[in-house]
């Protein structure tokens, strides 16, 4: 498993960091086998594997359940778990209790929190010994306000994002995810910050990249964002399922090769 210090060294040495968002045991096993640096269990699991309309419906219990499965599948990969909507911003005591619960019960290496307004939360968690990854730019828990579109597209917003990035680093964030922002802005932030900056829809000059397992493999994807590249095609599984269905209906499956041939009924009826 790469440690946080080793991930930091990758940034210093200008070696790119790979991150994949995964949600269950089998996908985690594949990600670890591919030697990906980091796995993120994102609250996007709400839409991707639970069928919710948005990330807002995801609960702490959902995150713990899936992250524990991912950890079992990838025991040797740096693991980050999302803090879901409603699990932060109530009060300091409640927020910390949930942070400890997520961090402790999942065996994650860090938690991830969305938004520039959480600097005090980052400080509080850091003081407790919980590493926090910040997420700026397009933050899915706030799409009801900002929408699914590129962020920081004008001068004022770009300046604000730079200030926010510095602020979360100063608060103690160990890493930053930048989503859906202009590539030159992401490059500037990556260059100026000391912590690793992982981009998604933020160009190639960030310290690393993250994509969702299902997106990059075209696995039950209903909408593909502009910044997603398809590296494989799991949709062919539908063809396999259709073939299975047809062979069952046609009494072609199971065949002799898939059948236990020992004759037992004569013995049973004796």
UniProtKB/Swiss-Prot annotation:
Q: Which Pfam families match?
A: Pantoate_transf
Q: How is the cofactor bound?
A: Binds 1 Mg(2+) ion per subunit.
Biological process terms from the Gene Ontology for this record are:
pantothenate biosynthetic process
Q: What is its EC number?
A: 2.1.2.11
- The entry's active site is 179
Which sites bind Mg(2+)?
43, 82, 114
Gene Ontology cellular-component terms for this entry are: cytoplasm
The metabolic or biological pathway listed in the UniProt record of this protein is:
Cofactor biosynthesis; (R)-pantothenate biosynthesis; (R)-pantoate from 3-methyl-2-oxobutanoate: step 1/2
InterPro entries per UniProt: Pantoate_hydroxy_MeTrfase, Pyrv/PenolPyrv_kinase-like_dom, Pyrv_kinase-like_dom_sf
Class of the enzyme per the UniProt entry, highest EC level: transferase
As cofactor, the record names: Mg(2+)
Protein residues bound to 3-methyl-2-oxobutanoate: 43-44, 82, 112
| Keyword terms of this UniProt record | Cytoplasm, Magnesium, Metal-binding, Pantothenate biosynthesis, Transferase
Superkingdom is Bacteria
Any single GO molecular-function term of the entry would be: magnesium ion binding
Instruction: Give the subcellular location.
Output: Cytoplasm
List the catalysed reactions. 3-methyl-2-oxobutanoate + (6R)-5,10-methylene-5,6,7,8-tetrahydrofolate + H2O = 2-dehydropantoate + (6S)-5,6,7,8-tetrahydrofolate
Role this protein plays = Catalyzes the reversible reaction in which hydroxymethyl group from 5,10-methylenetetrahydrofolate is transferred onto alpha-ketoisovalerate to form ketopantoate.
Record family assignment: Belongs to the PanB family.
> Which proteins does it associate with, and in what oligomeric form?
Homodecamer; pentamer of dimers.
Name used for this protein in its record: 3-methyl-2-oxobutanoate hydroxymethyltransferase
Provenance organism = Staphylococcus saprophyticus subsp. saprophyticus (strain ATCC 15305 / DSM 20229 / NCIMB 8711 / NCTC 7292 / S-41)
Upper taxonomic classification of the species?
Bacteria, Bacillati, Bacillota, Bacilli, Bacillales
The gene coding this protein: panB
């Amino acid at each position: 498993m790469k440690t946080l210090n080793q991930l930091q060294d990758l940034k210093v040495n200008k070696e790119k960091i790979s991150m994949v968002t995964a949600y269950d045991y089998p996908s985690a096993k594949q990600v670890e086998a591919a030697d990906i640096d980091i796995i993120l269990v994102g609250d996007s699991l709400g839409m991707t594997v639970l069928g919710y309309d948005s990330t807002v419906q995801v609960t702490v219990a959902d995150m713990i359940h899936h992250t524990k499965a991912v950890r079992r599948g990838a025991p040797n990969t740096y693991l980050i778990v999302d803090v879901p909507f409603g699990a932060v911003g109530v009060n300091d005591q409640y927020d910390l209790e949930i942070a400890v619960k997520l961090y402790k019960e999942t065996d994650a290496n860090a938690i991830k929190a969305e938004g520039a307004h959480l600097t005090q939360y980052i400080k509080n968690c850091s003081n407790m010994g919980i590493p926090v990854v910040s997420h700026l730019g397009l933050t899915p828990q706030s799409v009801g306000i900002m929408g699914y579109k590129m962020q920081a597209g004008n001068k004022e917003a770009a300046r604000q994002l730079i200030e926010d990035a510095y602020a979360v680093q100063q608060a103690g964030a160990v890493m930053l995810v930048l989503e859906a922002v202009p590539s030159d802005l992401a490059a500037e932030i990556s260059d100026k910050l000391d912590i690793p900056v992982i981009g998604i829809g933020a160009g190639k000059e960030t310290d690393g990249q993250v994509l969702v397992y299902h997106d990059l493999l075209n696995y039950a994807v209903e909408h593909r964002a502009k910044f997603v590249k398809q590296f494989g095609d799991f949709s062919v599984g539908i063809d396999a399922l259709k073939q299975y269905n047809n062979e069952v209906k046609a009494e072609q499956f199971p065949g002799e090769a898939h059948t236990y041939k020992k004759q037992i009924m004569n013995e049973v009826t004796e």
